[in-house]
UniProtKB/Swiss-Prot annotation:
Cofactor: Zn(2+)
Gene: Spg7
Functional note: Catalytic component of the m-AAA protease, a protease that plays a key role in proteostasis of inner mitochondrial membrane proteins, and which is essential for axonal and neuron development. SPG7 possesses both ATPase and protease activities: the ATPase activity is required to unfold substrates, threading them into the internal proteolytic cavity for hydrolysis into small peptide fragments.
Top-rank taxon: Eukaryota
GO molecular function: ATP binding; ATP hydrolysis activity; ATP-dependent peptidase activity; metalloendopeptidase activity; zinc ion binding
PTM section of the record: Upon import into the mitochondrion, the N-terminal transit peptide is cleaved by the mitochondrial-processing peptidase (MPP) to generate an intermediate form which undergoes a second proteolytic cleavage mediated by proteases AFG3L2 removing an additional N-terminal fragment to generate the proteolytically active mature form.
FT transit peptide: 1-43
Subcellular localization, as worded in the UniProt entry: Mitochondrion inner membrane
Residues in the Mitochondrial intermembrane compartment per record: 166-248
Binding positions (Zn(2+)): 574, 578, 650
Comp. bias intervals (Basic and acidic residues): 109-134
Self-association state and partner proteins as the record states: Forms heterooligomers with AFG3L2; the m-AAA protease is composed of heterohexamers of AFG3L2 and SPG7. Component of the mitochondrial permeability transition pore complex (mPTPC), at least composed of SPG7, VDAC1 and PPIF. Interacts with MAIP1.
Gene Ontology, cellular component aspect: axon cytoplasm; m-AAA complex; mitochondrial inner membrane; mitochondrial permeability transition pore complex; mitochondrion
Protein name: Mitochondrial inner membrane m-AAA protease component paraplegin
Length: 781
């Protein structure tokens, strides 16, 4: 604090503005002393200004120099050593110092030469403003250096303390070796301060720290304990350690705490003052960068990027967003009819369906600026940044209007605001959401700024965000249909080198992948190409796609996991039970492949089915799906008279289907045609249920009856076909993998007619037929 007061006093006495005058006054020299004599060329001053000052004397300036010189030199050396500042010249520039100094005569000559000749008044005003900005920058840099010097001085004073020691270390390492100079007792804190001789050797090394603190249990008997230790060490009376008592008192401690608090508050005030200078020249840009929205600008006029032709499928969604593109291209066509284009659109749908890809296509097709930003980038740990970034984003959008603002994963900032009854509240997120609502449809809303947002959690969005006037156009992007999957495969297969035309694979792959998203389809095509490259093929073949589909569905085969003979038999009968029940029942899907090879997704085996693109299910179809899922557990119980934990996933699926039939689909006669929302995982017990406890017990009872009836039916089917179950299990134990043709050869065709299937083996046969016509021969899978 004394150093700070002295520095301020010297600053007030400085005759001219600028930091170098201050350093010159503190050192007792004038700027002319550092220049060449007469008209000689000035030279660059090496070293710090404080380091050039005289160290002697007892003036306030010399005292301040002795305090601040080590700190300044330490900070300068650290910045240069760590390469934080590239050179000493740059360090002088940052600290506001002057590199070149002239004599007074040369300085006056330069002023005369630099006088403007025939300048306009506005040029003089601009020159005056430039000098004011430079002076402001100098003052801010000097204040920054002043704070660094004070902090380093405090740290330097604290560095003389060597920390805490124990009584044993004090006696054995210090007292016994004669390194203790004096001892000071602080009774109020039960602390003893031990001062050592300069150059003392402690723990085998010379120590720079000369003061150590020691906690004492009974401070009143410390001196008695010290004298007893000296007696044991045979220390003579003249060499005994002097003991003094330090009583600070209440006012001393209070003044010390008040002083440290004042220093901390002053530093905080200065930091926030710098933050308030953002936006003006001379201010620190770091605070301004925090408040700026980190968005990505896509210029659609360049023609580079994703177009609607590159987005396969999503026909209805593209029609919805094309209206925004048409409005931005030719708004007069809409305005002359009095139409108002929606302010924004919300893209909804499961993950991986192409919401972000569609937004990129809009950016290219609209040929207007496209400002994209992710929802999580708004909210930070510092309060108020989210709202500031929203304002910054829309300010930039208005300046570039007409334009499109795209917010990805808007659920990060658009969650429903908490009510007074709930204790889960996030003020920062709510403030960000409120600012977003105002910018989208508030008093200062500007036209020609369209907002697009995407999320896969529309249920958590605030109602005010979804109302007409904001995100009033809701575009739902569902999982692709069979035709859309074929188009997506065609799009991704264009970049692959194939043995057959892309149309040969696209239809079959689309039928193999019901329920797959666009991201899953892209992953399959990429995995097929990677597998072909690993195998050393020059093009992608059918079995590469077969491997890719199997890898995405069940994972890769884990050859390092070796099962015992008994476990292999259990897995074989388990998977055979699934396959046999699915083969014999009427409303089940075709079994494409059965494998007992362990997989990386923790599955010991799997049965690959070919589900249909179906949107309506009857009670009989759902019941037989439950029977097929229970086929593995029933086969284990029949074959081994015991069950294992391998059916855990099957039981989970059966339970979900049973409760859906009872609670949502109204398929339980005793419950009636009612439907209740599905309970969300992780929220059990939170909120009120829309049914009574008695009705809950009735639904539980109906679900148990439904599962029990499905299990009995599954057991009956397997008991009536034990020979077929045994044949399938033996084939699996022998080959590990069997397909549709193998099952048909073992147990005959399905009793309810052939099931629809797409066997990859037929693709290979088609390739072989083409090879016979003279084309390149495909390697064996």
């Amino acid at each position: 604090m004394a150093a700070a007061l002295l520095l301020l006093r010297a600053l007030r006495q400085s005759p001219e503005p600028g930091p170098w005058r201050l350093w010159a006054q503190l050192s007792g020299r004038s700027p002319g002393l550092f220049s060449g004599a007469g008209g000689r060329r000035p030279y660059v001053v090496r070293g710090t200004p404080i380091g050039l000052a005289a160290a002697g004397g007892h003036t306030p300036q010399s005292l301040l120099l002795r305090i601040l010189t080590p700190s300044f030199e330490g900070v300068s050396g650290l910045l240069l050593k760590r390469h934080i500042v590239p050179s000493a010249i740059r360090l002088w520039q940052l600290s506001g110092s002057t590199l070149y100094f002239n004599t007074s005569g040369l300085k006056q000559k330069n002023k005369d030469d630099d006088k403007p000749k025939g300048k306009a008044p506005e040029d003089d005003e601009e020159e005056r403003r430039r000098k004011e900005r430079e002076d402001q920058m100098y003052r801010e840099r000097l204040r920054t250096l002043f704070i660094i010097a004070i902090v380093m001085s405090l740290l330097n004073s604290l560095s003389t303390s060597g920390g805490s020691i124990s009584w044993a270390d004090f006696v054995n390492e210090m007292l016994a070796k004669g390194e203790v100079q004096r001892v000071q007792v602080v009774p109020e804190s039960d602390v003893v301060e031990v001062y050592l001789h300069p150059g003392a050797v402690v723990f085998g090394r010379p120590r720079l720290a000369l003061m150590y603190r020691m906690q004492v249990a009974n401070i009143d008997k410390f001196e008695e304990k010290l004298r007893a230790a000296e007696d044991e060490l045979n220390i003579e009376s003249k060499d005994r350690i002097p003991v003094s008592y330090k009583r600070t008192g209440f006012f001393g401690n209070a003044l010390y705490a008040l002083g440290m608090t004042a220093v901390g508050l002053a530093i905080l005030w200065y930091v926030f003052r710098l933050a308030g200078m953002t936006g003006r020249e001379g201010g620190f840009s770091a605070f301004n960068q925090l408040k700026m929205a980190r968005f990505t600008i896509v210029d659609g006029k360049t023609g580079k990027g994703v177009s609607f032709q590159d987005v396969a499928g999503m026909h209805e969604a593209k029609l919805e967003v094309r209206e925004f593109v048409d409005y931005l291209k030719s708004p007069e066509r809409f305005l002359q009819l009095g139409a108002k284009v929606p302010k924004g659109a919300l893209l909804l749908g499961p993950p991986g369906c192409g919401k972000t890809l569609l937004a990129k296509a809009v950016a290219t097709e609209a040929q207007v600026p496209f400002l994209a930003m992710a929802g999580p980038e708004f909210v930070e740990v510092i309060g108020g940044l989210g709202a500031a970034r929203v304002r910054s984003l829309f300010k930039e959008a208005r300046a570039r209007a007409p334009c499109i603002v795209y917010i990805d994963e808007i659920d990060a900032v658009g969650k429903k605001r908490s009510t007074s009854m709930s204790g889960f509240s996030n003020t920062e997120e709510e403030q960000t959401l409120n600012q977003l609502l105002v910018e989208m449809d508030g008093m200062g809303t500007a036209d020609h700024v369209i907002v697009l947002a995407s999320t896969n959690r529309a249920d958590v969005l605030d109602n005010a965000l979804m109302r007409p006037g904001r995100l009033d156009r809701h575009v739902f992007i569902d999982l692709p249909t069979l035709q859309e999957r074929r188009e997506i495969f065609e799009q991704h297969l264009k970049g692959l080198k194939l043995t057959q035309p892309s149309s040969f694979y696209s239809q079959r792959l689309a039928e193999l992948t019901p329920g797959f998203s666009g991201a899953d389809i892209a992953n399959i095509c990429n995995e097929a190409a990677l597998h072909a490259a690993r195998e050393g093929h020059t093009s992608v073949h059918t079995f590469n796609f077969e491997y890719a589909v199997e890898r995405v569905i069940a994972g890769t085969a884990k050859k390092s996991k070796i099962l015992s003979k008994e476990e292999q038999r259990v897995v074989a009968f388990h998977e055979s039970g699934h396959a046999l029940v699915g083969w014999l029942l009427e409303h089940t899907e075709a079994v494409m492949k059965v494998s007992i090879a362990p997989r990386t997704n923790a599955a010991l085996g799997f049965s690959q089915m070919l589900p249909r693109d179906q949107y309506l299910f009857t009670k009989e179809q759902l019941f037989e799906r439950m029977c097929m899922a229970l086929g593995g557990r029933a086969a284990e119980a029949i074959s081994f008279s015991r069950v294992t934990s391998g059916a855990q996933d099957d039981l989970r699926k059966v339970t979900r289907i049973a409760y859906s039939m009872v609670k949502q689909f109204g398929m339980a006669p005793s419950i009636g045609p009612v439907s209740f929302p599905e309970a969300q995982e992780g929220l059990v017990g939170i909120g009120r249920r829309p049914f009574s406890q008695g009705l809950q017990q009735m639904m539980d009872h109906e679900a148990r009856l439904l599962v029990a009836r499905a299990y009995r039916h599954t057991e009956k089917v397997l008991l009536d076909n034990l020979d077929k179950l045994q044949a399938l299990a033996n084939a699996l134990l022998e080959k590990e993998v069997i397909n549709y043709e193998d099952i048909e050869a073992l147990i005959g065709p399905p009793p309810h007619g052939p099931k629809k299937m797409i066997a990859p083996q037929k693709w290979i046969d088609a390739e072989k037929e083409k090879q016979a016509s003279g084309e390149e021969e495909a390697p064996a899978p």
